[in-house]
């Protein structure tokens, strides 16, 4: 359902992040396939999140192919637009 169905969607998140839970529910409710990567205890993933967010630990950070964007605070309209999925179920 994304712009390019061949591009994998990766969501970098933490266990205690309410915005991450909202984003995950949003994606699941719309049938969007994605891989979740927890950055806690994962120095490589945390480093990537810091690098793509100008040194800030912003979660969730979403990767689509080579493109990254932070969805923090959670914004359903932004996420729907970025992934070309319906805003409403």
Where is each model-derived feature located?
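Local sequence-structure signature of Cys/Sec-based thiol-disulfide redox active-site neighborhoods
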Residues: 2-33
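Small/polar loops that bind or transfer phosphate-bearing groups
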Residues: 12, 37, 41, 71
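Thiol-based oxidoreductase modules, predominantly thioredoxin-like and allied folds used
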Residues: 32-46, 56
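Short, charge-rich, low-complexity interaction segments located
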Residues: 47-51
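Structural micro-motif
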Residues: 53-62
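Non-catalytic, surface beta->alpha helical segment in thiol-disulfide oxidoreductase systems
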Residues: 64-89
């Amino acid at each position: 359902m994304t712009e390019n169905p061949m591009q994998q969607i990766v969501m970098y998140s933490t266990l205690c992040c309410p915005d991450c839970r909202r984003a995950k529910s949003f994606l699941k409710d719309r049938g969007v396939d994605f891989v979740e990567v927890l950055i806690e205890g994962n120095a490589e993933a945390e480093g990537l999140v810091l690098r793509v967010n100008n040194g800030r630990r912003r979660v969730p950070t979403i990767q689509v192919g080579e493109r990254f964007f932070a969805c923090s605070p959670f914004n359903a309209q932004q996420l729907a637009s970025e992934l070309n999925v319906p805003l409403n179920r």
